[in-house]
């Protein structure tokens, strides 16, 4: 729920029509690998329990020895990537605390990309709250 790996989004070129370069960099840290391994181990334990007997076949992938490589190569987010335009006052932030993109006059970002860290729950309520707060401070 709280990955420590960090990816990046960079511009391919100055043409706004061209898609950006997106590097998710999933499971790049030892901590993320460990958490994924623990989750898969728990799922395996549950599926091996009496409650599931007769409902499952033998495990096909990844096999006990290949778990880390499987997680590194196949693990990804189900949905809700966020944090690509981090909000903050530090030099690495993309926007200020009002969602204004640093160095681009007149452009604001108000979505889940502002979150420096993902929340434990659904992002919808947090994004609505950010949008309400930022829009309340805007003047027409």
What are these regions (language model features)?
Residues 1-126, 134-140:
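FAD-dependent oxidoreductase catalytic-site/capping-region signature
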